[in-house]
UniProtKB/Swiss-Prot annotation:
It comes from Homo sapiens (Human). Residues 1-398 are annotated as: Required for targeting to the nucleus and nuclear pore complex. This is Nuclear envelope pore membrane protein POM 121C. It is found in: Nucleus, Nuclear pore complex; Nucleus membrane; Endoplasmic reticulum membrane. The gene is POM121C. Residues 155-166 have a biased composition (Pro residues).
Amino acid sequence: MSPAAAAAGAGERRRPIASVRDGRGRGCGGPAGAALLGLSLVGLLLYLVPAAAALAWLAVGTTAAWWGLSREPRGSRPLSSFVQKARHRRTLFASPPAKSTANGNLLEPRTLLEGPDPAELLLMGSYLGKPGPPQPAPAPEGQDLRNRPGRRPPARPAPRSTPPSQPTHRVHHFYPSLPTPLLRPSGRPSPRDRGTLPDRFVITPRRRYPIHQTQYSCPGVLPTVCWNGYHKKAVLSPRNSRMVCSPVTVRIAPPDRRFSRSAIPEQIISSTLSSPSSNAPDPCAKETVLSALKEKKKKRTVEEEDQIFLDGQENKRRRHDSSGSGHSAFEPLVASGVPASFVPKPGSLKRGLNSQSSDDHLNKRSRSSSMSSLTGAYTSGIPSSSRNAITSSYSSTRGISQLWKRNGPSSSPFSSPASSRSQTPERPAKKIREEELCHHSSSSTPLAADKESQGEKAADTTPRKKQNSNSQSTPGSSGQRKRKVQLLPSRRGEQLTLPPPPQLGYSITAEDLDLEKKASLQWFNQALEDKSDAASNSVTETPPTTQPSFTFTLPAAATASPPTSLLAPSTNPLLESLKKMQTPPSLPPCPESAGAATTEALSPPKTPSLLPPLGLSQSGPPGLLPSPSFDSKPPTTLLGLIPAPSMVPATDTKAPPTLQAETATKPQATSAPSPAPKQSFLFGTQNTSPSSPAAPAASSASPMFKPIFTAPPKSEKEGLTPPGPSVSATAPSSSSLPTTTSTTAPTFQPVFSSMGPPASVPLPAPFFKQTTTPATAPTTTAPLFTGLASATSAVAPITSASPSTDSASKPAFGFGINSVSSSSVSTTTSTATAASQPFLFGAPQASAASFTPAMGSIFQFGKPPALPTTTTVTTFSQSLPTAVPTATSSSAADFSGFGSTLATSAPATSSQPTLTFSNTSTPTFNIPFGSSAKSPLPSYPGANPQPAFGAAEGQPPGAAKPALTPSFGSSFTFGNSAAPAPATAPTPAPASTIKIVPAHVPTPIQPTFGGATHSAFGLKATASAFGAPASSQPAFGGSTAVFSFGAATSSGFGATTQTASSGSSSSVFGSTTPSPFTFGGSAAPAGSGSFGINVATPGSSATTGAFSFGAGQSGSTATSTPFTGGLGQNALGTTGQSTPFAFNVGSTTESKPVFGGTATPTFGQNTPAPGVGTSGSSLSFGASSAPAQGFVGVGPFGSAAPSFSIGAGSKTPGARQRLQARRQHTRKK
């Protein structure tokens, strides 16, 4: 509404309100005011709502309520009655002109004014802040009468009506006058009174609003509002008559705000008393109003000037104190306390703070002086930040105590030492911290380190003692300190205030946080270790020597290297921090922490203590295992900690539980030590468990971790499963038993749900429920939630002969960690199936099929772990070839940040080295983000592992297209379930694109869940994390691999999984089956996707390239689509899947177009793919489409498992039911 229209409408509405008010005001002083306010509010609402005055209305309502409550009490009723009478008389005299000016509006105000004279006077006085001018309230009355009827009804000013016209102008002008000269009031009155009366009425709510401001202004809450209000009022008053009402409020606000906070009560009293007497007539007069406004302005200006002057002086003092810009830079951090700490340079902040309070200025000055003096020695800006960081690193207590001390009487000495300490000790502190981390991993926190550091190491103690001595007594360490001391004492009082701000202000660096976390983790680890040390000590002592932390590199020859190769330290700071975290658990490997610190998680020997807990040697005396197992989780660290289990290469032969020393030597002895240390990473923690060689007879995987909620069931034979330490993830150690099943231990136990332990070894029980997998069943277990599925190789049981490798390391964790597991296969033929481990968050892990045990290295955020021995690890995206010639290549998994993929080694039959896949495949790509490579692991020849789910559901085992799910589909944390069961690849080498698959394994093994691995969530064997049904399909859509996010197999995000042989699964994001790509990296040997995602399909089909984002994967033949790579045909001739869609990627049945056909909808839809080929396309984001039949396994691949993406629920109902049923079954198991 235009102001005029609004004013007019409001005026009409308010007039009746005014009349009502008049009647009520006259009738009853207090109640009438409240009633009038209510009526005025209603009128205002009606008027304002269309005018977009919702805010004004709220303000009006609040102001009206305030007035109603405050007015009656303010003006005593005797006073109010008296004043009302006086005002009413005055208004009668003054009102005629005012009324005439008002054009009849004044009459209504008169009635209102009559009732609330005293209240008005009080209000005017209180708001104006002057005893005389406040009384001019009658003047406002004239103006206010129109406006006030709505606004001041509570005041019940009968007198208002009398003076209203002139007062109205005056009052209105008052408001503007606060910001502007009296001229406005004088000029505005006549037009406004006459012409804008309706506007004024409309403005009435605003008048209340200004009053509301004044109310807050008194507390000091709304001073800004008052300022704005004044300016706005000045502007608004001309604009709208509302300002007429607001002027009154403005009057009140200025005094309350600056002037009247202390004086308001006095002013109110004076105004109430004086206004009725001599000032009553004056208030009506313009002159009185103007004079009052002028006085207010003068007072305000004076106050402002004073404040500005004080602020300026304070700023000058601060500047002088700081004696330089550097000092000023310091000041904000130290001096300004909380706000200043955020700002590097104090200038503006100081001023702002100064303006806020003189006390703050003084405090700031003192702080700045002390800080500035300190800064003089050091660089001005940087030292302060470093100091802050240092204080945080030393621990809040040290910095804080120093700051407090500074404030204290001896603050100057303390401050100088504190600042000097912060700066000088900072470097030593860092070194010391490092030493402490290595030597004293136990130091709980930066604080603890600070406290301990004095008494702790000589190096630490000397610098810190010096610092402390300085802080305690002002050491004359430097002239600067003396200066600081001198300056500080003068400002000691101020400094008292300052100390807290420095605490707030000191910057905390990521390092500080990391140190604290590490310290806390160390405490946890120490507590766990203390228990486990007794058991673990025997084991731990030897291994430390052997493999230092395993970095990414994995030992080339799995055998000899496992102990040695891993040593490479990782440069990652994150890894180092994790390692540091880990080392504390195995304090003995302090050296490890230093060197291994780099990649502690992986180094098996390092944390022998961890290993034994892990139950390294499964065969070893179970007695040891239990304790270690319990401890096993000592290594587990909660979030940040990473215990590194030492990798013990298990020799084929039994590994003694201690094994590490032995294994270090032995692992080479047998072809497949394959103990890959498994790491499980729970949320942030990684821990590796060394896989201990299993005793030949029984593979027992010791559960790495005990589920948090429930103890894992003990392994059948070992009974090993000690309740793991709390850590959720369990890394199963794989035993590389010769013979019989390899045990894969489920690598990681899902926090929420358990994965079944691999078959023979009941690895760790899932947290919630322990399930043990039947012994024979390929070990893959799928972790539920964690999606760590270790895919143990599906293989394990099949050929007893092959030592089935048991996949080696299991789950890495993931955030970024990949663990590579390689179980080395037993020596020759058997491929080791690597169990794939899912990463929680997406670290993929690779398992090396090859005999060499691969260590899964933990991957930190983007690093891929090294894979199986042969394979090299690729870092980000590079794919690593698996070196292993025959037996199995190991696949390396790389990790993607989100989804990692893990490669499995396919190593097919021993004979067939073929596995080019293994070489390539694994590596294929590691996608930095979520690469997943999985090679399907053929089970041993003769065994077809059949994905439980749809994988190869339709296929007859041995069928050309056995879907050979990658032996592990890596699971993704999110949803990856990890490995798909190994599919049989019917053809050994022949797979057209990739030889990945060992040739036909005759008997299929069923994966526990569906695919070899469970999906974390409910995915089928391959089960994608979320629920992709098909073993092969990834959660999102990749058929094979599960991806929680959608990477099919491994990749976290888009990784697709590789498909078993023909059916390709598509990854959600588009990676093609073979390897999902999280973000795009996928390595599929066969086709490559532009993004790097390719998946190779096992056996025949090549995978098509995956997509990086939306790449879908295509059918078997390896064709890669570039980005979105559509689909490849499958070599087998099985229908190829349709290409996935880049973003959406669904793969559809082979022929169908991505979009057309069932292609998955991108976002959450899922389309079922009809038809054969697996369709399971997944859509990249959330949509997953399950092919309708695919679930059934119609497609050659067997099913497209619909994958579930994050939110997408698209699964075929049948698939979901199956998944649910299977989940239940697995849990029952």
